[in-house]
Amino acid sequence: MAHKKAGGSTNNGRDSESKRLGVKRYGGESVLAGNIIVRQRGTRFHAGNNMGIGKDHTLFALSDGKVQFEVKGPKNRKFVSIVAE
């Protein structure tokens, strides 16, 4: 006769895999065309000069140069640009 009740099941114990979002190249860093600058959900950062935007809102460099972050416009939006070196 068992003197302890059998362990029950639980509904916890799951979590989704992290998506590795965020800034990949910071202001002042040199980049090559095609380098990913920011991975994001939605447009937390907007594409500035010499920047492309993917269907998942990833920002990437269209030309070689240095990364530049700036806040501009009436809504204080964050823009990322590539400035020629």
UniProtKB/Swiss-Prot annotation:
Q: What is the lineage of its organism?
A: Bacteria, Pseudomonadati, Pseudomonadota, Gammaproteobacteria, Alteromonadales
State the family it belongs to.
Answer: Belongs to the bacterial ribosomal protein bL27 family.
What's in the GO CC field?
cytosolic large ribosomal subunit
Region feature (Disordered): 1-24
Q: Does the keyword Ribonucleoprotein apply?
A: yes
Recorded source organism is Pseudoalteromonas atlantica (strain T6c / ATCC BAA-1087)
The protein in question is named Large ribosomal subunit protein bL27
A Pfam cross-reference name? Ribosomal_L27
Q: State the signal peptide span.
A: none
